[in-house]
């Protein structure tokens, strides 16, 4: 049977509240034991049978019940005093304070001032003289040999507690009872003893200087995380880490939960358009700060320049023509990374020109929406883009009878939702996309009403008839190709169909 040992606590799958030191101060194999389940443990079982060192090797060090799950450890880890008793019924007070790194042991009967005396008498006991230390699988030389001082041992105890406190927000505190022993050991124990294996393979010390070195090294984990954070993308849904190099090949879909993460406009163009067929339009069109918007934090022009350097784009939308499985299409893709995909005068003008070009060339149109709405730095000029784009779409759809598909990604809000985002002949949404006109916080502050959770998510809105299908990214290109062919748009070369 495997025994988890950590000074004043024993671990065997779940945390056991009723224990003091892992080994008795006065006799081998007899743990100082706390037999109470209250917040302030007291001694209430004077006849508790505790296995001695003469028991078989398969016996457990602990003869206690599983009283408190690991998730309740926060209740007694910070600053507590335990009243415990060894097999000789000698009472001890064990006090520890994590914040101040205090660990004290007092004997209630004889008021021993130096705990080292107890260890000295223990090491010279008759048991140690009669029984071979190396033959006893429960003998831990790192704790009881004289060259390892009591101070180092206590420092190890406090260090392990502190290391646990740092990791206390991990999954170990969830409501699940299916705890993995190794997982608990990793975060709490710092050392392990297995009574069925030899000493050379089963004893791991936490009492020497290497444990303190490990603690110091762990303090640099945050710096290491910051150094390599650019290599990983964290999922917004499950908070799992996805390796950035592989994420693009997986269409920016989380490998842990399948959540559709945000994609750049360039990645979406690469996903939908056949290689070598992309022809961009109006790439040199940039905003000139038409209303001379003043900001205390950063001038509008400087902010535009910073996003241009950051994304490599000139504005929050890319427009152009290309082929989708051999079918010529006009496509505009908004990029949320550029000022939240906000729609200003340049964005509206580029989309309007794209629609007019598709009208003249009789091309099917795709607009991929990812926007926070109208750009406030351009005032009413940004608001008028809603009407301008809608007017161009009216001519495209009603007069020319051409086919327009709107793809709503996360997030699609504000003026984009109120204009061309909802004007498609077919409106497609990505799974779990956030789609709304006004955000949850704006609605709650304006109407003083609570917005239900999930009421602005694609799956909920689908049942309300807000759009047509919800299509994941994997089959999206094939779905678009079938829709175009259904509406009499065919590839120029039949052999180019993939």
Swiss-Prot record:
Pathway: Lipid metabolism; malonyl-CoA biosynthesis; malonyl-CoA from acetyl-CoA: step 1/1. GO terms for cellular component: acetyl-CoA carboxylase complex; chloroplast stroma. The lineage of its organism: Eukaryota, Viridiplantae, Streptophyta, Embryophyta, Tracheophyta. Binds 1 zinc ion per subunit. Keywords: ATP-binding, Chloroplast, Fatty acid biosynthesis, Fatty acid metabolism, Lipid biosynthesis, Lipid metabolism, Metal-binding, Nucleotide-binding, Plastid, Transferase, Zinc, Zinc-finger. Residues 231-498 form the CoA carboxyltransferase N-terminal domain. GO terms for biological process: fatty acid biosynthetic process; malonyl-CoA biosynthetic process. SUPFAM superfamilies: ClpP/crotonase. Component of the acetyl coenzyme A carboxylase (ACC) complex. Biotin carboxylase (BC) catalyzes the carboxylation of biotin on its carrier protein (BCCP) and then the CO(2) group is transferred by the transcarboxylase to acetyl-CoA to form malonyl-CoA. It holds the Pfam family Carboxyl_trans. A zinc finger (C4-type) spans 235-257. Zn(2+) binds at residues 235, 238, 254, 257. One of its GO terms (molecular function) is zinc ion binding. InterPro entries: AcCoA_carboxyl_beta, Acetyl_CoA_COase_Trfase_b_su, ClpP/crotonase-like_dom_sf, COA_CT_N. Residues 36-59 are annotated as: Disordered. Its EC number is 2.1.3.15. This is Acetyl-coenzyme A carboxylase carboxyl transferase subunit beta, chloroplastic. Acetyl-CoA carboxylase is a heterohexamer composed of biotin carboxyl carrier protein, biotin carboxylase and 2 subunits each of ACCase subunit alpha and ACCase plastid-coded subunit beta (accD). Belongs to the AccD/PCCB family. It is found in: Plastid, Chloroplast stroma. Its cofactor is Zn(2+).
């Amino acid at each position: 049977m495997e025994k988890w040992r950590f000074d004043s606590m024993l671990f065997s799958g779940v945390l056991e509240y009723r224990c003091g030191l892992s080994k008795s101060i006065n006799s081998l194999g007899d743990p100082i034991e706390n037999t109470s389940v209250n917040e302030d443990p007291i001694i209430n079982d004077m006849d508790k049978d505790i296995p001695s060192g003469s028991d078989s090797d398969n016996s457990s060090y602990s003869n206690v019940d599983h009283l408190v799950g690991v998730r309740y450890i926060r209740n007694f880890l910070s600053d507590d005093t335990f009243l415990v008793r060894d097999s000789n019924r000698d009472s001890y007070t064990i006090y520890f304070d994590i914040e101040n790194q205090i660990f004290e042991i007092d004997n209630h009967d004889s008021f021993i001032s130096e705990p080292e005396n107890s260890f000295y008498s223990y090491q010279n006991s008759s048991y140690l003289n009669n029984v071979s230390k190396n033959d006893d699988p429960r003998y831990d030389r790192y704790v009881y040999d004289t060259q390892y001082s009591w101070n180092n041992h206590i420092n190890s105890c406090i260090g392990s507690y502190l290391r646990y406190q740092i990791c206390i927000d991990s999954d170990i505190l969830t409501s699940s009872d299916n705890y993995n022993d190794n997982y608990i050991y990793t975060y709490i124990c710092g050392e392990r003893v297995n009574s069925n294996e030899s000493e050379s393979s089963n004893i791991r010390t936490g009492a020497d200087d290497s444990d303190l070195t490990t603690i110091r090294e762990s303090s640099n984990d945050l710096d290491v995380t910051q150094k390599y954070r650019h290599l990983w993308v964290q999922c917004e849904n499950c908070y799992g880490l996805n390796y950035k190099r592989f994420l693009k090949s997986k269409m920016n879909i989380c490998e842990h939960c399948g959540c559709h993460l945000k994609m750049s406009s360039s990645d979406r163009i690469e996903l939908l358009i056949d290689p070598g067929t992309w022809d961009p339009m109006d790439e040199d069109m940039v905003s000139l700060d038409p209303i001379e918007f003043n900001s205390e934090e950063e001038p509008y022009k400087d902010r535009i320049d910073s996003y241009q350097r950051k994304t490599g784009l000139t504005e929050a939308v890319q427009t152009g023509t290309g082929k989708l499985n051999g079918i010529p299409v006009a496509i505009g893709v908004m990029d949320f990374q550029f000022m939240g995909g906000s729609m200003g005068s340049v964005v509206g003008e580029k989309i309007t020109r794209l629609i007019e070009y598709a009208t003249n060339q009789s091309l099917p149109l795709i607009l991929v929406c990812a926007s926070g709405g109208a750009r406030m730095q351009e005032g009413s000029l940004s608001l008028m883009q809603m009407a301008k784009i809608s007017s161009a779409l009216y001519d495209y759809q009603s007069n020319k009878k051409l086919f327009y598909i709107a793809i709503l990604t996360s997030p699609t809000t504000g003026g984009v939702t109120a204009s061309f985002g909802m004007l498609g002949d077919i409106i497609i949404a990505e799974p779990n996309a956030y789609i709304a006109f006004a955000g949850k916080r704006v609605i709650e502050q304006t109407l003083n009403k609570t917005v239900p959770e999930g009421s602005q998510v694609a799956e909920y809105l689908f049942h309300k008839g807000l759009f047509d299908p919800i299509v994941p990214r994997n089959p999206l290109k094939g779905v678009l190709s079938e829709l175009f062919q259904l509406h009499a748009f065919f590839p120029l070369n039949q052999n180019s169909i993939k």
